[in-house]
């Protein structure tokens, strides 16, 4: 304990564990490393009796993975692209094969573009950020992170000769895009301190990075900058995106030297997203349409919203989440009553249809539809009991074809069941809850253990999916559920708005209310809660506000020191997220945030058993947030329940990068919960 005062215009706070913070991106002070290693050793000792169970769980989870697996090929500009996992490999190989929109050319060789296992060799962490192939199909640019801090390096490869150019550009974001000349590459440099988006640059292949030209530098650091291309391939798109506003600037792909022009100007509280094809812009906007509507405009009219015409009207009962443009049709992704579904609208106005679903609770999501000449749209389908399935739907007939159902080895769907429940909230709302169980192992008698996930932030819809790892819990009598709490967008933009800023407490109340409903309706006797990042904030809040409702809580890379972080603009994400949580420089926002910030509300009272997971190189939620949280909680709580922290010293926000390596962390959590539930195997 070292006294330290965190100052603000609205009051000072003691932070006796502030000494655990070290902003050095390459190494931490010896006393901090000693502390973190001691925490890891303590957690290992406390869980040593579950070692055999953890090993069993890892074997079970790995046995469900088809080790020699391939993705469904995706078409773009004369090639079909895919990934392949070889037996035992942690990382995939990226492949391509020549072909047409009808399919790959069987006579053409399968080319290796990127060999991730080779790139990751001898590295404790490897993450392929993004990649882009030049329009002439000869050059590959990609970004990679070898630390886990989401600091990427840009590299370029000649796909004809296999030569990797010596040029490397460090400190860039993942997204990159080529101009039409196949020589000019647009990328975004990271702010060296916050690691967030900085200025857009263009690089000419074969020249030194020092000669790269500044294209655009956004002064408003609450906006996030990304680059892309339009479906027509006529424009390089520079997007400036915040939680409440957007702006689009474009550069002609044929004239990359031109300065970007404003195509969609930012407007307060208006979010618009546009794409271009066949001489017109299609715009998804919430202007006068809370759940979004679709507009269209010519090139000349795009900058003036008064000249737009409506293409798809606003619906109060449906949220327009996304769209994809094809030469012959427009495909919409809409959400109705928590289900995401697709609707196809031919440009000729004839034969529109909604894509068929086979279950009552499901999610469809637009896939990688990269070439508008395709006669079929690619989409994914998921539910609590259905493995991820890739479909193509014929844009003319509506006929669906299954391209691949993700193998879950040993999974027998007939043994499991699922339901969509609606839990009443304390303020009269209906909270969707997706639940799954094994029919011959689970008993709905009010005694069963239940594994409950939640998130509730950023408008992210935590959709139902088959959690293959959780089958190890279900086979031992657990139920598995997701509480779709406010702050997500499962029930539209209003559901999102009612779980942020001054309404953030609704997120926590919803999770607790869903928990109590599941107990009252005899779905659960003991509830074990888990959430990560902003979902870790949710876990920290419920631990303070209703902790003893839970038999155990697991927090993954948790955002728990809300006010201190949001006061510090040097920390990644802070300025970008003031419109999400509030700006604590303002008194009203400060008081709201301090009222729920988990670190600031730890009390001298009993807490449930808790397990905290973090990564030393996490740039999204810095390692010292969970480290301080655990230290203060251990000092103040009055019970003898276990409080454990595992700090991965070689990873960041996403945990281990290898597909098998990360199973060990999940096995630790499951063994912790199974042990608390009294289930040894």
What positions do the PLM features span?
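Active-site-proximal cap/loop segments of hydrolase catalytic domains
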Residues: 482-681
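Cap/lid segment of the alpha/beta-hydrolase catalytic domain
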Residues: 113-134, 143-151, 160-165, 351, ...
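Residue-level signal for short, function-critical loop segments
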Residues: 287, 329, 457, 533, ...
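Beta-propeller folds
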Residues: 1-388, 392-397, 467, 649-650
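Alpha-helix capping and helix-loop boundary segments enriched in small/acidic/polar residues
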Residues: 128, 170-176, 191-195, 220-224, ...
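A structural signal for short secondary-structure junctions
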Residues: 275-276, 288, 324-326, 336-337, ...
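Conserved beta-strand segments of alpha/beta enzyme cores
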Residues: 112, 214, 479, 642-644
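Secondary-structure transition/capping motifs at alpha-helix termini
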Residues: 102-105, 147-149, 159-163, 179-182, ...
